[in-house]
């Protein structure tokens, strides 16, 4: 992990590669590097830390029109200059960048590379050294590349330079995202389209176990058997302005403010000309034919799934289970006879979720992906897709994708309810419109959120979020946002569980953020607040208008109670943002985190 770029053409490759890497910064990384074909061979530049440091060491006088680049998020070996990509073979003939994990790299070293002295701790160096070993047996570069890949077990997206064939880039993909971009007398390679929108909007999607030979005039796709594959390019539905901050200091703040527009966009996309919710009939029938829904997700998407369970069970009266993908893949529960799977992933590339999807596909079960990236791996491999229509989300901490997931899940639940003849009792599209209006109000109250962050979180070591019913799930997401970007030890708890152990953590001055948006548990959560105050906690109560009481810290505009999670999370996002600012943290690129987790 975490991002690859490549360029071959007539322009200066260095600047294109560096700008491409900068567009991949949102994915998270700890080091970066580029390699370029120069007059006297391949030149490698790499540094631990930010791309700005890498820029400082790149020689502007080196003329080159071919190169590859990489941002690394450490999986094998500590973050360091030595472990940063690109990696080279001993003779320096081959230079390689790689995303993914080679599971059998130690076995490959033992069987094929015992005489090689390795420079780094990475699994990636094994690939480039194996490439050189295969060529030494008399194979052509292409044959050696295919042989090398056939010996590897795991995931990879690879860009390879050959010093003896300077006018081409070799590319390969398996279980890790990679695109080839099409230009006029140039071509590019990228982990996602955003990296290369500066030069093209035409991309060719690569499938698993394919290799590509890229020159400035041609793109040749082959399978591992050497058979040529024809595939037309697609136009990326993005604009370069979509991935710029504009006047905002951070992408996260921009994306928080975009949430009302996202909700309105979702309403428009999922209703017919009469204003009625309309989903694909095939999705509806597949769910109606099932006897239980299983939601599979990670992180923020998992929290969205917990709320989605409430929507589906309350609206459509269908049983739902929600599972963390990384646990489900090796601890699968006993399934019902006719399960239906919903995979939630902002990027559509989450490796843990994909591992489960592969399993359930092999079992013959139908699956739906809810993702912000149609055409992503999960989208391609599932039977159905519901797009989020949220636009690119650049900040590592998810905000607008989360509320988009909630909106789409509510629409899905309402559609199934209607098909089953269940009475919803309210007009969902109208109520979602009111949610968007409430979001506008909340986004205009940044000064209040900043003040709360300063009062409760600027200097604290830890923080607890409590809630009952669906507020508990929103609290989990609030705690995740806070810990992600401010590095405060934050945890979410069910209010009723406090007395079963958690309350032992409360000490004098501990901030406790309590959510009170559900009428049927309002008195219960108020009692929990009294419990923690009695132990010295510093409470911050966020309530819904109509449920507020004297002493509440912030009152949310009223929306339909079922949709309260979509508005209750906005203050938590903003409080987390301002807490991170007060603590001088990197809001958009928090330490140790990657936006798209493409390895298990």
From Swiss-Prot:
Give the UniProt entry's GO cellular component terms. Answer: cytosol
Q: Give residue ranges for domain Glutamine amidotransferase type-2.
A: 2-217
> Does the keyword Transferase belong to this entry?
yes
Q: Which InterPro entries match?
A: GATase_2_dom, GFAT, GFAT_N, GlmS/AgaS_SIS, GlmS/FrlB_SIS, Ntn_hydrolases_N, SIS_dom, SIS_dom_sf
Q: Top-level EC class, please? A: transferase
Reactions mediated catalytically: D-fructose 6-phosphate + L-glutamine = D-glucosamine 6-phosphate + L-glutamate
**Where in the cell is the protein located?**
Cytoplasm
Coiled-coil region list = none
Q: Domain of life here?
A: Bacteria
Does the keyword Iron-sulfur feature in the UniProt annotation?
no
NCBIfam families tied to this protein: glmS, PRK00331.1
Q: What is this protein called?
A: Glutamine--fructose-6-phosphate aminotransferase [isomerizing]
Species per Swiss-Prot/TrEMBL record? Bacillus cereus (strain ATCC 10987 / NRS 248)
Gene that this polypeptide is encoded by: glmS
């Amino acid at each position: 992990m975490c991002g690859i770029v490549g360029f071959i053409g007539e322009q200066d490759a260095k600047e294109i590669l560096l700008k491409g890497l900068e567009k991949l910064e949102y994915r998270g990384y700890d080091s970066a590097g580029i390699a370029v074909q120069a007059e006297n061979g391949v030149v490698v530049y790499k540094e631990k830390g930010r791309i700005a440091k890498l820029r400082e060491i790149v020689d502007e006088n080196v003329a080159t029109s071919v190169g590859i680049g990489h941002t690394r998020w450490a999986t094998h070996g500590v973050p360091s200059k030595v472990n940063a990509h690109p990696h080279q073979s001993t003779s320096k003939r081959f230079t390689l960048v790689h995303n993914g994990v080679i599971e059998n790299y130690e076995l490959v070293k033992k069987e094929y590379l015992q005489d090689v002295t390795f420079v780094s701790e990475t699994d990636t160096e094994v690939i480039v050294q194996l490439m050189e070993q295969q060529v030494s047996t008399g194979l052509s570069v292409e044959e050696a590349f295919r042989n090398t890949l056939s010996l590897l077990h795991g995931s990879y997206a690879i860009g390879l330079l050959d010093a003896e064939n300077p006018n081409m880039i070799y590319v390969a993909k398996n279980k890790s995202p990679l695109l080839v971009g099409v230009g006029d007398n140039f071509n590019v390679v990228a982990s996602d389209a955003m990296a290369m929108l500066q030069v093209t909007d035409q991309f060719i999607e690569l499938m698993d176990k394919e290799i590509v030979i890229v020159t400035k005039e041609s793109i040749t796709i082959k399978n591992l058997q050497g058979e040529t594959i024809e595939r037309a390019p697609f136009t990326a539905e993005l604009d370069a302005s979509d991935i710029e901050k504009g006047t905002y200091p951070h992408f996260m703040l921009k994306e928080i403010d975009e949430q009302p527009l996202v909700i309105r966009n979702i309403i428009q996309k999922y209703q017919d000309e009469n204003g009625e919710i309309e989903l694909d009939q095939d999705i509806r029938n597949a769910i109606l034919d099932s006897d239980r829904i299983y939601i599979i997700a990670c992180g923020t998407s998992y929290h969205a799934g917990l709320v989605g369970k409430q929507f589906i069970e309350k609206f459509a009266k269908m049983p739902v289970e929600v599972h963390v993908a990384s646990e489900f893949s090796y601890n699968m529960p006993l399934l019902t006879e006719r399960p239906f799977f919903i995979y939630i992933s902002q990027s559509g590339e989450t490796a843990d979720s994909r591992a489960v999807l592969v399993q359930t596909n092999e079992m013959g079960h139908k699956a739906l992906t809810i993702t912000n990236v149609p055409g992503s791996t999960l989208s391609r491999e599932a039977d159905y897709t519901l797009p989020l229509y949220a636009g690119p989300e650049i900040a590592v901490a998810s905000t607008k994708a989360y509320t988009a997931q909630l909106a789409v899940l509510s629409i899905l639940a309402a559609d199934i309810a209607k098909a089953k003849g269940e009475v919803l009792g309210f007009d969902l599209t109208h109520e979602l419109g009111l949610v968007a209006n409430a979001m506008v109000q909340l986004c205009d109250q940044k000064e209040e959120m900043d003040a709360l962050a300063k009062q409760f979180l600027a200097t604290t070591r830890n923080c607890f979020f409590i809630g009952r019913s669906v507020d508990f799930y929103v609290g989990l997401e609030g705690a995740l946002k806070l810990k992600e970007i401010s590095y405060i030890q934050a945890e979410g708890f069910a209010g009723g569980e406090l007395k079963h152990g958690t309350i032992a953590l409360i000490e004098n001055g501990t901030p406790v953020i309590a959510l009170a948006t559900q009428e049927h548990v309002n008195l219960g959560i108020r009692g929990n607040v009294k419990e923690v105050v009695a132990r010295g906690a510093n409470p911050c109560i966020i309530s819904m208008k109509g449920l507020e009481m004297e002493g509440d810290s912030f009152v949310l505009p009223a929306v339909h109670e079922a949709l309260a999670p979509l508005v209750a999370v906005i203050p938590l996002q903003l409080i987390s943002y301002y807490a991170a600012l007060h603590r001088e943290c990197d809001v958009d690129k928090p330490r140790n985190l990657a936006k798209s987790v493409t390895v298990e």
